[in-house]
């Protein structure tokens, strides 16, 4: 099963303001749709 928690790398991207990169990395890893990925990344901000 795939973890829907953010990785340290993804959290660093969010902290650096690289939201598009974080969303892409999260989607590539989890296979979720864009809306779900964006909501997850936004929640981590």
Whereabouts are the PLM-identified features?
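Short, amphipathic alpha-helical interaction segments embedded in low-complexity terminal/linker regions
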Residues: 1-45
